[in-house]
Regions:
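A short amphipathic beta-strand at an alpha->beta junction
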Residues: 457-469
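Non-catalytic positions within long, well-ordered alpha-helices that form the structural scaffold/packing
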Residues: 27-30
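Helical "lid/coupling" subdomains associated with nucleotide-phosphate turnover
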Residues: 2-25, 39-46, 51, 59-81, ...
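Short secondary-structure junctions
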Residues: 410-415, 456-460
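Conserved beta-strand/loop subsegment of P-loop NTPase cores
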Residues: 32-36
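Feature 926 captures the class I aminoacyl-tRNA synthetase adenylation module centered on the KMSKS loop
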Residues: 331, 445-456
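Acidic, divalent-metal-coordinating active-site segment for phosphoryl/phosphodiester hydrolysis
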Residues: 96-102
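A short interface-forming secondary-structure element
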Residues: 430-447
Length: 469
């Protein structure tokens, strides 16, 4: 392909078949508008314009060849609306180019499209089946020259956030080595030392053996050395310790660009991606379920604040409890009687953005443990290996808070008007105000069942005072 700098006939034919299938499905679903863009491979190819004309003729699609700057902007939108970082360096590593963007306070400070990609570097410098040492060193020199022309990247010491096929394959390889319990790649973190171990492994194996590496797709095995070498040089130039892998990129950026301009007053950057995505998941609920979920969230948040001296949780833990409270019944979509177990799985696998994998596992623990884990369930908790003893300990405390909040609306009638707590060394007195003309027996029964678990966890007696108003 890159000997002549032209798109090959087989490559163009594969793309056309995919686009024709896409257009066919879009028509079947009565889609009235399609936005289609082409990136560096078409932008840099001598026959790129010819390919765009062929696409128009064969599919009816107006394929827009976007600039490197626009490619970086759209990649940024896909990342910033799905990853909870404020300051970081994005790289979108493709076949023909690498878009690099410096982000500060969730805004683009500077970006560049580097003319180095996994496919073009392999095609340019690898002349045989494998890189010779001389060829590899030439490629590394070319990568460094391209990166070092951007002094604004040097020693930023910010996390690297990678999107694109190379980044995803790196994450898959690392997860398989660790027998990682969460298969999701989005927001997966890889420390520098584990990345270099992976790079050493792929460099040490010929193509046939690389194809057998668990987690590495056979289609990418031929170009993975060049791709990972770009990441390695970025790691060193930026001088950072962690690679974060993003599952959302340019494609999602196209959506957020449209969504922002049409539904967010022209701003394609969502202010609070965690709450926004949680509320998006809540859209699947009925009106009554939604009212109940938001009510439980308010009650749990009130108890978190009033009982702070008992758990000493920070604001990040408060947000964990808020999201777990909002989505505590999500598992009922699968099965009512075991909804806590299903909710645990769904919390980890739903499109909830702005959370690390550890935070996802922690929220799942809150939901599952709020219904009481047996010793066997606790030991075999699927995502437990991601939580340390301290996280489990605070998780058990917050689980009790969530359980009591749920019990306070056991009847789904939203009867609790106000909560007030009086805390002493031996006792917590919870004063619950409710309408005097309403029957509160269902709620009373549910709350009283949690007095014993509360004492076991907080080492204090929970005294309930029911106060009709």
């Amino acid at each position: 392909m890159w000997g002549s700098h032209k798109l090959t006939e087989p490559a163009m034919n594969r793309a056309l078949v995919s686009l024709q299938s896409y257009v066919h499905m879009a028509k079947a679903l009565e889609v009235n508008s399609i936005k289609a863009v082409a990136t560096a491979a078409v932008r840099l190819a001598k026959n790129g314009d010819e390919f765009i004309e062929t696409v128009k003729r064969e599919t009816g699609l107006d394929l827009e060849c976007i600039s490197g700057e626009e490619e970086a902007r759209l990649g940024f939108l896909g990342v910033i609306n799905t990853i909870g970082l404020k300051d970081f360096v994005i790289f979108d590593l493709g076949g023909a180019s690498t878009e690099v963007t410096l982000v500060r306070n969730r805004q683009i400070e500077q970006s560049v499209s580097l003319p180095i990609g996994a496919l073009t570097l392999t095609g340019t410098y690898q002349k045989g089946d494998e890189f010779t040492d001389k060829e590899y060193n030439k490629m590394i020199k070319a990568i460094r020259n391209a990166i070092e022309e951007q002094p604004w990247l040097k020693n930023t010491k910010m996390p690297l956030l990678g999107i694109g096929g190379t980044a995803r394959n790196i994450a898959k390889m690392d997860q398989r080595k660790l027998s990682y319990p969460i298969t999701k790649l989005h927001n997966y973190e890889i420390p520098y030392h584990r990345f270099t171990e992976l790079l050493d492994e792929v460099r040490s194996k010929p193509l046939g053996q690389r194809k057998k590496i668990n987690g590495l797709s056979s289609e990418r095995a031929a170009i993975i050395i060049a791709g990972m070498s770009i990441v390695y040089e970025l790691f060193n130039y930026v001088n950072c310790k962690t690679l974060v892998v993003g599952g959302s990129g340019l494609r999602e950026g196209l959506f957020y660009d449209y969504y922002g301009h049409n539904y967010l007053g022209g701003n394609p950057i969502i202010p609070d991606i965690l709450i926004h995505s949680a509320e998006n998941v809540l859209l699947e609920m009925t009106r009554h379920e939604l009212v109940h979920a938001k009510y439980i969230c308010r009650l749990a948040d009130t108890l978190f604040e009033q009982w702070w001296s008992l758990h000493k949780g920070d604001n990040a833990l408060r947000r964990c409890l808020q999201v777990a409270s909002l989505l505590h019944d999500i598992g009922k979509r699968v099965n009512y009687y075991s909804h806590a177990r299903h909710g645990c799985y769904m919390l980890v696998n739903s499109n909830l953005y702005g959370m690390t994998h550890i935070e996802q596992a922690f929220r799942a623990f809150l939901v599952m443990n709020s219904h009481g884990l047996t010793p066997k369930e606790y030991k075999n908790f699927l995502y437990g290996k991601l939580l340390d003893d301290e996280q489990r300990s605070i998780g058990q405390k917050l689980s009790i808070i969530l359980a009591i909040a749920e019990a306070l609306d056991e009847s789904h009638e939203q009867l609790v008007m106000n909560l007030d707590s009086r805390i002493s060394p031996d006792e917590v007195r919870l004063i619950i105000q409710y309408p005097k003309h309403r029957d509160i027996d269902i709620t009373k029964g549910a709350v009283e069942k949690l007095v014993k678990p509360f004492k076991k966890e907080f080492k204090r007696q929970l005294e309930i005072e029911w106060s009709p108003q």
